[in-house]
Amino acid sequence: MDRQVKGILGAKLGMTQVWDNNRVVPVTVVQAGPCVVSQVRSHQKDGYAAVQLAYGAIDPRKVKKPISGHYTKADVAPRRHIVELRTTDAAEYSLGQEVTVEQFPAGISVDVTGKTKGKGYAGPMKRHGFHGLRASHGVERKHRSPGSIGGCATPGRVFKGTRMAGRMGGVRYTVQNLTVQAVDTENNLLLVRGAIPGPKGALVLVRTAAKAKKGGAAK
């Protein structure tokens, strides 16, 4: 990845709304960081440039010994979560450095990655938005069924990837080009326009947008 990436781990607190030029803007509040740098990778030693961020308090007794040794080597207290970001400016970071929300000014575009809410086993109407069958006129107790998934002779099989009922949610998902509405550096809060994946309290990764629109933040 040949670009500079700023990132931070945090927890989704929930949604609220703020006023902006007499308009109501829905925002998601993220308790972002502070994170600590636990490792810096370089082209000379590792073959690529990256920075490793650690986040979240944890009882040191619950940390496995290999991971505990990793933190001891970096001379930082153990954290619950670790993420690695490939960035060209990794050499500018140092072990033990604290990363806060100050690197995300208001108006910047960001990508937010998290794990979506798990919905369990769901039918095609809920999972894929199928219209369903008619309410009457010959339809018999099959109103929410998917319909045909493949003819008996042609094609004589079910194609791979056919949308059917199954487990819904609980997957890694990234929402791109969200705008940072406001930043609270005292309380380590990011207010991001729109919704982000996951329930309240879910772990999220906020990064500078990979496909940011030219001329500033995405509208």
From Swiss-Prot:
Coiled-coil spans in chain: none
Name the GO cellular-component terms. Answer: cytosolic large ribosomal subunit
Q: Name one Pfam family in it.
A: Ribosomal_L3
- Gene Ontology terms: biological process: translation
Asked whether the keyword Transmembrane is assigned, the reply is no
Give the top-rank taxon of the lineage listed in the UniProt record for this protein.
Bacteria
Name the Gene3D superfamilies on file: 3.30.160.810, Translation factors
Please name the PANTHER family in this protein's record: 50S RIBOSOMAL PROTEIN L3 (PTHR11229), LARGE RIBOSOMAL SUBUNIT PROTEIN UL3C (PTHR11229:SF16)
HAMAP family under this entry? Ribosomal_uL3_B
Complexes and interactors: Part of the 50S ribosomal subunit. Forms a cluster with proteins L14 and L19.
The protein's name is Large ribosomal subunit protein uL3
Please give the organism.
Answer: Salinispora arenicola (strain CNS-205)
